[in-house]
């Protein structure tokens, strides 16, 4: 069975959480596949920067992992770190992201495509 791994961040600022909407309509957190010779933290920082243009400070002690089987039958591991914005101007990666929003926690939970 093929194994895929993605890393990203749950970004909190002023009691709001940042969600992205992918061009396929799925809402979630900024994340992406781990590249060769890249750590989980490096992947998370890179993906957040690529997808949202912001810089984050990751709390590596706050790490959440999900494991599931994809529609294609691959084993998928998603690692998310808690992070806060420390710089950059929010803008979306137009090729992959259709929308970015800061939402209160309740709205974010209701918007998430994968719960």
Residue ranges and their predicted role:
Residues 1-29:
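N-terminal strand-loop-strand
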Residues 34-115:
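Unchanged
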